[in-house]
């Protein structure tokens, strides 16, 4: 397949700027591509994470049967590796646009927390979050930083010793209902929707 590159002309930048300035309600949608400059590879593609790891550890059935093996990979990729990444210019630019009232909401598929670390506030995490863990037994929620510092894997619920699962979407799980609702709500309110 031939590689194509797309370059915006100055007129395109001016037009985009005008649209953003004129919009009464702007929603921005981001995916893995925005975090590549921060050193986080995308999941799919030539250098994607799934070329290095078998993604089956993110199936709920596999996770429950093999919690230690699953958590070792989850911790390595989504906590140890992702926590070393810093927001890039795009994350900071988006946060600045939001601060100035030019972006009203950010819908992201990412669970790397880089939008939050850059200062963005109104973020809908479409695929959930890595910041919290939920006990599969008693459903209590916990801050992942507090429970994962010990690196005892798999982490267990301090109340019932149940298995804790990160609050991001595994392959066979639906999008969290609140994320789905808010994404639909903000998208329908958008005068300008930026992909």
Question: Language-model segments: what does each one mean?
Answer:
Residues 1-195:
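Conserved catalytic core of sirtuin-type NAD+-dependent deacylases
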């Amino acid at each position: 397949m031939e590689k194509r590159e797309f370059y915006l002309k100055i007129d395109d930048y001016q037009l985009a700027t005008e649209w953003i300035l004129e919009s009464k309600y702007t929603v921005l949608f981001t995916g893995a591509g925005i975090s590549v400059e921060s050193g986080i590879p995308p999941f799919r593609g030539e250098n994607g994470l799934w070329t290095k790891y078998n993604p089956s550890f993110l199936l709920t059935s596999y996770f429950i049967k093999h919690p230690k093996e699953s958590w070792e990979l989850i911790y390595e990729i989504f906590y140890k590796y992702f926590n070393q990444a810093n927001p890039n210019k795009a994350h900071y630019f988006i946060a600045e646009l939001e601060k100035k009232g030019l972006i009203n909401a950010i819908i992201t598929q990412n669970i790397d927390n880089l939008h939050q670390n850059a200062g963005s506030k109104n973020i809908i995490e479409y695929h959930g979050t890595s910041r919290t863990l939920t006990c599969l037994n008693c459903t209590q929620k916990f801050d992942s930083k507090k429970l994962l510092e010990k690196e005892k894997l798999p982490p267990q619920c301090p109340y019932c010793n149940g298995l804790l699962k990160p609050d991001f979407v595994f392959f066979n799980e639906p999008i969290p209902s609140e994320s789905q609702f808010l994404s639909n709500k903000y998208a329908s309110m958008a005068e300008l929707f930026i992909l």
